[in-house]
Amino acid sequence: MSKTNNRRSSNWYGKMDKDGFIHRSWMKSQGLPDHVFDGRPIIGICNTWSELTPCNAGLRNLAEGVKRGVWEAGGVPLEFPVMSLGETQMKPTAMLFRNLLSMDVEESIRAYGIDGVVLLGG
């Protein structure tokens, strides 16, 4: 963590204060080793996968491939869910919730300490 950079994630994971310690500790509790917090970019993978949404069924496997690619490129992938809208399953229509989905995605990106994002949606 001796590297200094201007990445957004460094405000979460790169600081050597109490907040930085807490952020790193929570992520390490998920099995991430110490060395991933050395200034690498944190890449969010926003996924609308759901068993209720048939058109998004393939996104679960696709997200795993994206994670491998992010690791191979030197980043740290962190997947996060957002609401999934399935036109064939929602009544009266999924159209009523599209703005809410947009807000869900935008605010999740804004709220988390990520440097980039891959959006997966059907």
Descriptions of predicted regions:
Residues 1-122:
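Metallocofactor- and cofactor-centric catalytic cores in central/energy metabolism, strongly enriched
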